[in-house]
A protein has these predicted regions:
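A structural micro-motif recognizing beta-strand termini
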Residues: 58, 71, 85-89, 116-118, ...
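Short, acidic/hydrophobic/Gly-rich beta-strand patch recurrent on exposed beta strands
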Residues: 82-85, 112-117, 162
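Zn2+-dependent peptidoglycan hydrolase active-site motif and core
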Residues: 94-132
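Conserved, short, structured surface segments that act as functional micro-motifs
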Residues: 117, 137-187
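Polar/charged, compositionally biased leader and regulatory segments
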Residues: 2-8, 14-71, 184-187
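Short, well-structured beta-strand-loop connectors
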Residues: 91-102, 133-148
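Short glycine/threonine/proline-enriched tight-turn/helix- or strand-capping micro-motif at secondary-structure
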Residues: 48-54, 65-94
């Protein structure tokens, strides 16, 4: 199944291609979570994520065995991701192959890792006790990238997990079946 996501194009300039991954990021990209990448989609406002083409070996649930305790979009404010509960210092894994765009403390996110994947998809992992990767590192699906914690604005150990395209967050449930901890290939 192909997931279609409307992507607002903000600027036209040079940037990563939809298929290619940059290994050198701008200062803006390494310092901010919400960053639109100009030219990422070559004038298209719609991208497709071919979930059916992703082999199981190129996907990993970011926190195997964890339980969603706060869904996307609900709560006192607009929740830009989901919260997955586990025990302290549990291993967080990269959901897909990609390149680390950001790895540092960042405001309410606490210690955060942002990984850019094919098709312009980015996954965000925050409130980490410790980040295990650095900006520019290439990561594989399932590779440990951080340990769960409660840094930033967090009241308990958990993973705050987001999916973004061109700086815009969207519901991770579009791509992931949180209950089964698999890709949502049958949506």
């Amino acid at each position: 199944m192909r997931i279609r996501i409307l992507v607002p194009l903000l600027l036209i300039a040079l940037g990563a291609t939809a298929q290619g991954k940059k290994t050198v990021f701008s200062t803006m990209e390494t310092n901010h979570i919400r960053v639109a990448t100009p030219g990422l989609f070559s004038q298209r406002e719609l991208i497709e994520l071919p979930l059916e083409d992703i082999p199981d070996t190129e996907y990993s649930f970011p926190l195997p065995g964890g339980k969603v305790i706060s869904p996307y979009g609900r709560g006192r404010g607009r929740h830009s991701g989901i919260d997955i509960k586990t025990y302290a210092k549990d291993t967080i894994r990269s959901a897909f192959n990609g390149v680390v765009r950001m790895s540092k403390p960042y405001s309410a996110y606490g210690n955060v890792v942002v990984v850019r994947h094919d098709f312009g998809l980015e996954t965000i992992y925050s409130h980490n006790f410790k980040n295990l990767v650095h900006c520019g590192d290439t990561v594989k699906a399932g590779q440990p990238i951080a340990l769960t914690g409660r840094t930033g604005r967090a009241s308990t150990e958990h993973l705050h997990f987001e999916t973004r395209v061109n700086g815009q967050h969207f519901d991770p449930n579009i791509i992931f079946n949180m209950k089964e901890q698999t890709l949502n290939r049958q949506r």
